[in-house]
Amino acid sequence: MSSKPQSIGVIGAPFSKGQPRGGVEEGPTVLRKAGLLEKLKELECDVKDYGDLSFADNLDDSPFQIVKNPRCVGKASEKLADVVAEVKKTGRISLVLGGDHSLAIGSISGHARVHPDLCVIWVDAHTDINTPLTTKTGNLHGQPVSFLLKELKEKMPEVPGFYWVAPCISAKDIVYIGLRDVDPGEHYILKTLGIKYFSMTEVDKLGIGKVMEETFSYLLGRKKRPIHLSFDVDGLDPSFTPATGTPVQGGLTYREGLYITEEIYKTGLLSGLDIMEVNPSLGKTPEEVTRTVNTTVAITMACFGVAREGNHKPIDYLSPPK
């Protein structure tokens, strides 16, 4: 496959306060060190690097009920939303390098300011749809979708730090792929709101080809619209991405991860991308960190056109040498 070069705006979001484990704030650094931006440029993408955001460490951040670090997390997403919106106004695809998945509140909010008709494909072992009232852990990286859904607006308490958030997607605008660790309250929300999901059971039953076909038919069947892919590396099996905060056995294979992203690229509709929850501190060995980072880079590259069948430039490779 070859097509016109894509323009990308890369935003590093070194933030960890949506969950308890240190190290996830190093995600952008290790992905940059692995040469991600250079590889995108080799693909002839037009890459603009917006650098890494800096996040204030709000010392006076007492919990809201059991919700931890609400002001820090809310402020970080607010800052990210502004930068993503800025990137989208230039017509670039926003590429957010996390950081923990609470940042999706900001990434999707900012994207929706410019493209309110967007749809979301959420690849993850978890639904991240607990509300501040259903959460058992209080970690905000397990709650971003609840802040984004219009249908949950009335069920959400006023959490300090989140006054700026306006729900921007409906239940019918999101599809989950890779689920295998869903809390009872989350399962209730999925079922009550009729949210479309493909847990690992459906992936096993249907195969990833059918899963993507059904995903596109569901989200794009009536009208082509911008896609926001929010990719938590724990959606993949921990044999491929061990260095992450909440790994769950029995996940998507390397091949399934590539298939998902290759197919999204082929639609030509990818408009925003989050690459979340790479935590180099949680690799048991340096090799586990390298494996996680290399897998994550490969998944990201597939979003921008690297295909397993190969790629070529639009020239005649068989023309006789001059």
From Swiss-Prot:
Cofactor note: Binds 2 manganese ions per subunit.
Subcellular location: Cytoplasm
Chain positions found as Phosphoserine: S7, S62, S217
Principal cellular location given in the protein's record: cytoplasm
Domain of life: Eukaryota
Cross-referenced Pfam families: Arginase
GO CC, alphabetical: cytoplasm; cytosol
GO molecular function: arginase activity; manganese ion binding
Residues the record lists as binding substrate: H126, T127, D128, I129, N130, T137, G138, N139, D183, T246, E277
Span list, region Disordered: 1-27
Binding sites annotated in the UniProt record for Mn(2+) 1: H101, D124, D128, D232
Catalytic activity: L-arginine + H2O = urea + L-ornithine
Modification sites for N6-succinyllysine: K17, K75
Cofactor(s) listed: Mn(2+)
Keyword Hydrolase tagged: yes
Keyword terms of this UniProt record: Arginine metabolism, Cytoplasm, Hydrolase, Manganese, Metal-binding, Phosphoprotein, Urea cycle
Enzyme Commission no: 3.5.3.1
UniProt binding sites for Mn(2+) 2: D124, H126, D232, D234
GO biological process: arginine catabolic process to ornithine; urea cycle
Pathway annotation from the record: Nitrogen metabolism; urea cycle; L-ornithine and urea from L-arginine: step 1/1
Family: Belongs to the arginase family.
NCBIfam families documented for this protein: rocF_arginase
Subunit structure: Homotrimer. Interacts with CMTM6.
Protein name: Arginase-1
